[in-house]
Amino acid sequence: MAQNMAPIFHFIAISLSCSFLFVLSSSQDSQSLHYPLPTSSSKPSLLVLPIQQDASTGLHWANIHKRTPLMQVPVLLDLNGKHLWVTCSYHYSSSTYQAPFCHSTQCSRANSHQCFTCTDSATTRPGCHNNTCALMTSNPVTQEAGFGELAQDVLAIHSTHGSKLGPMVKVLQFLFSCAPSFLAQKGLPNNIQGALGLGHAPISLPNQLFSHFGLRRQFTMCLSRYPTSNGAILFGDIYDPNNNYIDNSVEVLLDMVYTPLGISLQGEYLMQVSAIRVNKHIVVPTKNPSMLSSNHGDSRIGGVMITTTNPYTILHHSIYEVFTQVFANNIPKQAQVEAVGPFGLCFDSKKISGGIPNVEFVMDSPDDVWRISEENLMVQAQNGVSCLGFVDGGMHTRTEIALGAHQLEENLVVFDFAKSRVEFNSNPLKSHGKTCANLFDLNNA
């Protein structure tokens, strides 16, 4: 009888063990998320990351979901950053954290060829192991840099479900840098714990998502002007007819213009702009051959870097002088007031209420123009004073123009790596009755 009962007890033991593992797994997910994760068989075609603006700095940031159990981690949006980095010195707790050994496959993928030795702590912890990979990490605002530990952990991001925000999907071994804490102590908005790199690098967020989920190599950015509402970054093909996440805004997609997308030696995103027009007057800069740009002759501006870590557009001095002079000449002289730093051209807000000059960036083709709205051009520097939101970068800028976050806000910007081009909505979103906040359904984000 005992021999006959043995298989039964064995079956019951296995069943109870499986039930326990299922309950444990479900309870861990329910502690960190309020909605179920999709099954492993689901394959998203579009991923969504909500983005917010910081009112005090004008920079943009996102809550990413990392670790086990999942936690929200606020990080700065760094369009040209090489990878995600977060500070791990304190309060980093995760059951799935790993630090790959030096010279491992993960290190090669991250272009890390130097071993990391931790001297900060007598005991090992996230960010502090020996014989791991060293990854140079920098604060994109202060330019401070230091070595972090290459690490991998779970990352989760929203998928889409029709025109709605869908459940989260996971990358189980997402590579990032566990960076020293001093990198987050200056220049960043309050409570920000790192930076999210979207640049042209092997382990940037886009490249890891493209590779892991098999997405089309394209991401779309829409930065909100308002700290109280979200913008978003979409990873995947927004033009795919099967992706109807922004079906209610198809007229915006029909208003896109494009120009070649270039990559600098440092992996930064560049776009080709042939001229700036102010009330149809073409602004032509003095050409500086030492600047990073395309060789199209003296009448072309060349490479324009797109950034999110400069709050305002920075112009090489030769361009800034001509641009501000032409702009000022199109506004009554009595409207001009003393400049408020960091800006060099400011006006009495009441005296320019009748309108300001039209400014357009002419793309690679003269028929393709990006019209910059008044809200993107002007900044309320102080009560009653409006300033042109462009900054003189001096004579030694690396690029002739570095587009800043303020000028990018409330614009749809598509980075299409498959076609090597960047796209902008030709007319401001508001001309279509849209904002970044209502272009996408970000409920439950």
Curated annotation (Swiss-Prot):
Function noted in UniProt: Sulfur-rich seed storage protein that remains undegraded at germination.
Domain Peptidase A1: 60-425
Record site: Cleavage: S293, S294
Annotated GO MF terms: aspartic-type endopeptidase activity
Identification of the protein by name: Gamma conglutin 2
Practical applications according to UniProt: May be used in antidiabetic therapies and diets for type 2 diabetes (T2D).
Signal peptide: 1-33
A GO CC term assigned to this protein in UniProt: extracellular region
Cystine pairings recorded for this chain: C88-C178, C102-C115, C107-C133, C118-C128, C346-C387
Cell compartment(s), UniProt: Secreted, Extracellular space
UniProt keyword Membrane, yes or no: no
Keyword hit for ATP-binding: no
Assembly mode: Two-subunit monomeric unit made of alpha and beta subunits coupled by disulfide bonds (at pH 4.5 and under non-reducing conditions). Can also form oligomers including dimer, tetramer and cyclic hexamer (trimer of dimers) (at pH > 5.5). Component of globulins complexes which accumulate in seeds. Interacts with flavonoids (e.g. apigenin glucosides) present in globulins complexes.
InterPro entries per the UniProt record, alphabetical: Aspartic_peptidase_A1 (IPR001461), PEPTIDASE_A1 (IPR033121), Peptidase_aspartic_dom_sf (IPR021109), TAXi_C (IPR032799), TAXi_N (IPR032861), Xylanase_inhibitor_I-like (IPR033868)
Glycosylation sites: N130
Post-translational modification: Glycosylated on alpha chain.
PROSITE patterns, sorted: PEPTIDASE_A1
Protein's GO biological process: proteolysis
Family: Belongs to the peptidase A1 family.
Other information: Capable of reducing glycaemia in mammals.
Origin species: Lupinus angustifolius (Narrow-leaved blue lupine)
PANTHER family linked to this entry: ASPARTYL PROTEASE-RELATED (PTHR47965), BASIC 7S GLOBULIN (PTHR47965:SF28)
Keywords: Allergen, Disulfide bond, Glycoprotein, Secreted, Signal
